[in-house]
């Protein structure tokens, strides 16, 4: 087997000029000449604003196509420019890999009221309050997309944690209460901070069947729409590993075993 070389084709402090996809398309042949076999691209989804690197993901179905969060383009450009960059990479024999952020959602459209307990940030298994109601940013309506591609709306019960109580204007880590709610099982996420299911924003609850169904639907749509040939999975130490194994298995069964998947797992060990 010929040695392969993957390149991370972005860094945190790129200019927010919307030209990154165009630059990548123009650079494709040069990368191939250098011997690059795989290119890891930054998150292509609509995030909190046009300057967001992409990890504050808002709408997985908006690749820089709809006027949402004050912008049509993402930090990197428009949907058609993203698709063109992918096609240019494939034409010169480079495998394009998408950065996929499935741990959380940010910048919800509406507040909702629901019950939580506050937990210790240093040990998320330790509750430090009795149950109480907060107003949290958990209702995602995606009005700018107007139900194109997918009509799912996210509500508080699709998440298991959030980090801000608008009612009291107070940040914290709030474990959402309700039937079958709670962090992922301790043996299915990293044990840093007791249970590291929660990282930031509104944390997806992979015990909820509607969440799983929507993410599977998104993956089918995304690969068909873009033609990417691999995923870099963000923040896998924070995501239920039972879901993640099944998700990767499903993608490979549909796209072929050569579909390249790797994950980010930061650990001090």
What residue spans do the PLM features occupy?
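Core domains of carbohydrate- and sulfate-ester-processing enzymes
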Residues: 118-195
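Active-site-adjacent "subsite" loops/lids of carbohydrate-active enzymes
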Residues: 125, 154, 177-220, 225, ...
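Active-site-proximal loop/turn and secondary-structure-junction residues that shape catalytic pockets
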Residues: 45, 102-106, 175, 182-190, ...
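Residue-level detector of flexible, active-site-proximal loop/helix-junction positions
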Residues: 67, 163, 268
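N-terminal structural segment of carbohydrate-active enzymes
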Residues: 1-95, 110-113, 204
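Short, mixed-charge, low-aromatic patches
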Residues: 33-43, 168-178, 197-207
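Generic structural motif
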Residues: 12-15, 209, 268
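Active-site-proximal helices and loops of the catalytic beta/alpha 8
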Residues: 2-4, 23-30, 50-56, 61, ...
């Amino acid at each position: 087997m010929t040695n392969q070389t993957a390149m991370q084709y972005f860094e945190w402090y790129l200019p927010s000029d919307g030209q990154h996809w165009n630059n990548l398309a123009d650079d494709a042949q040069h990368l191939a000449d250098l011997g690059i076999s795989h290119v890891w691209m930054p998150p292509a989804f609509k995030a909190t604003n046009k300057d967001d690197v992409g990890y504050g993901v808002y709408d997985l179905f908006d690749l820089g196509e709809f006027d949402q969060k004050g912008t049509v383009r993402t930090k990197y450009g428009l949907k058609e420019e993203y698709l063109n960059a992918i096609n240019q990479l494939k034409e010169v024999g480079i495998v394009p890999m998408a950065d996929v952020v499935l741990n959380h959602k940010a910048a919800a459209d509406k507040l909702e009221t629901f019950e939580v307990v506050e937990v210790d940030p240093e040990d998320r298994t330790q509750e430090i309050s009795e149950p109480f109601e907060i107003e949290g940013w958990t209702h995602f309506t995606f009005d700018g997309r107007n139900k194109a591609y997918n009509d799912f709306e996210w509500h508080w019960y699709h998440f298991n944690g959030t980090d801000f109580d608008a009612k009291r204007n107070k940040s914290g880590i709030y474990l959402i209460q309700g039937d079958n709610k709670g962090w992922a099982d301790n043996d299915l996420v990293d044990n840093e901070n007791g249970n590291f299911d929660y990282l930031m924003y509104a944390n997806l609850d992979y015990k909820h069947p509607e969440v799983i169904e929507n993410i599977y639907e998104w993956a089918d749509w995304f690969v068909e729409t873009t033609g990417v040939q691999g995923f870099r999975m963000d923040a896998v130490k924070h995501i239920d590993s039972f879901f993640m194994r099944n998700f990767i298995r499903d993608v490979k069964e549909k796209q072929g075993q050569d579909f390249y998947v790797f994950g980010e797992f930061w650990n001090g060990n």
